[in-house]
């Protein structure tokens, strides 16, 4: 009996280390080529390739460490974020949204994405008001809307920081930071990096964040607030920063 149990445990361990299999469908996607790519903050590294037939795809491979990655389609401006681990992962994308299962890290990532969604929803809600104020030439109202949106962003950023604190050594936390660090100023990025544990800092994404901090350090400036840009009836683009500069 002990030998059977030992053999079963050995088999389970081997299966856990065997690699990943990512299967799924993208609704409405024409036949073509797809690939999984890792993003280190500056460039994409292709990890696996697959044909897409009737919207279906299958990737297989192995990662040395769990990582955030993107499913991308050749010739399409299209990407699906997934938390890639050596496991069986299912991906379904369509009008109803993106659903990824099989990856433990995905559960954490979905919490981060819920925060992003709250910002996007608020922006969509405020944009018509901002456009109306712009057309009316009401700069005070435009500033009021911008301030309201900024509060939403700051609240979401505070919740994001709490999530990173709750998952300091998760590769998901480093992936979230890497994905957005191109829009971060020095102090903001440094603060997020400080929330990571040593294990996370030692990952490829953790090292990429450290490299970006070093790059920004010599030209550090204050954090830039989110901006609204709209088109005037005359066809000119105008943003909040244009207004502030007048």
What are these regions (language model features)?
Residues 14-158:
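A non-transmembrane, solvent-exposed segment enriched in polar/low-complexity residues
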Residues 207-242:
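N-terminal "domain-start" segment that seeds a small globular fold
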Residues 245-246:
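Loop/turn elements at helix/coil->beta-strand transitions in domains of secreted/extracellular proteins
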Residues 14, 77-79, 99, 106, ...:
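N-terminal targeting signals for export/organelle localization
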Residues 1-2:
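Bacterial N-terminal signal peptides that target proteins for export
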């Amino acid at each position: 009996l002990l030998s059977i149990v030992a053999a079963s445990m050995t088999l389970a361990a081997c299966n856990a280390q065997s690699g990943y299999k990512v299967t799924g469908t993208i609704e409405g996607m024409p036949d073509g080529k797809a690939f999984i790519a890792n993003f280190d903050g500056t460039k994409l590294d292709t990890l696996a390739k697959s044909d897409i037939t009737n919207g279906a795809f299958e990737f297989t491979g192995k990662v040395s460490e769990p990582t955030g990655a993107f499913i991308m389609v050749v010739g399409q401006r299209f990407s699906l974020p997934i938390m890639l681990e050596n496991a069986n992962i299912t991906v379904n994308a369509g009008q109803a949204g993106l659903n990824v299962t099989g990856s433990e890290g995905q559960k954490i990532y979905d919490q981060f994405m819920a925060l992003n969604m709250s910002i996007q929803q608020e922006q969509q809600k405020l944009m018509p008001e901002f456009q109306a104020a712009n057309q009316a030439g009401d700069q005070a109202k435009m500033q009021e809307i911008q301030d309201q949106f900024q509060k939403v962003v700051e609240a979401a950023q505070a919740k994001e920081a709490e999530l990173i604190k709750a998952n300091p050594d998760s590769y998901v936390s480093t992936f979230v930071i890497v994905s957005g660090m191109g829009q971060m100023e020095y102090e903001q990025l440094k603060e997020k990096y400080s929330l990571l544990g040593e294990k996370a800092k030692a990952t490829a994404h953790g090292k990429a964040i450290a490299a970006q901090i070093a790059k920004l350090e010599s030209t550090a400036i204050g954090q830039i607030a989110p901006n609204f840009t709209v088109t005037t009836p005359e066809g000119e683009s105008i943003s909040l920063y244009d207004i502030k500069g007048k």
